[in-house]
Curated annotation (Swiss-Prot):
The gene is mobA. One of its GO terms (molecular function) is GTP binding. Its cofactor is Mg(2+). Gene3D superfamilies: Spore Coat Polysaccharide Biosynthesis Protein SpsA, Chain A. It comes from Desulfosudis oleivorans (strain DSM 6200 / JCM 39069 / Hxd3). One of its GO terms (biological process) is Mo-molybdopterin cofactor biosynthetic process. CDD domains: MobA. This is Molybdenum cofactor guanylyltransferase.
Amino acid sequence: MDAVTGIILAGGESRRFGGGNKAFRMLDGRTMIDRVHDTVKSVCDDMVIVANTPLDYLGWNAVLATDLFDFRGSLVGIHAGLMSAGHEYAFISACDTPFLKQAVIKTIIGGIEDHIDVVVPEKKEGMEPLCAVYSRRCLEVIERHLHQGRMVIKAVYNKLRVRTISEKRLRAVDPDLVSFWNINTKEELEKAEAAIKAGRIS
């Protein structure tokens, strides 16, 4: 398997959580970013954390990066992460998917080939660009879009060689697709805690 950098988009303050950094919200005794970090690190060869407040992560064994453009957004975070990646390919994850499965990451990474720029899961609801592999070759196209103020990740795909991973293949290793469960609000965090306590998820 190719050497791959793991990149976590940690962001910063979350208004939907009522302020504070949602990456450090506790879930079943661990922060959300701890859960994501440990899963990604178990598969990837080195780590990058992209954060608005990188000083919060000084104790972590990871390269720390921050946005290089004045405006914020996931595409800006992807750009910052790829700029700091130690390998040609990087697996990118958001910090708010605490049930991300190692097997899902391996399945996505397994789609890497020299002629492919992006490997992205595609469920019936659409693609999952924040649980995907990107080549550093994407940087030129991403920078062009950012300089033009174009922030939609999927719009970048039109200029890149993209391989999708089908929902069928994803369900083979994650039947309930819990890897893609985003925790964006206090209510969703409470539902996740309840699911863990009920033994429906771990």
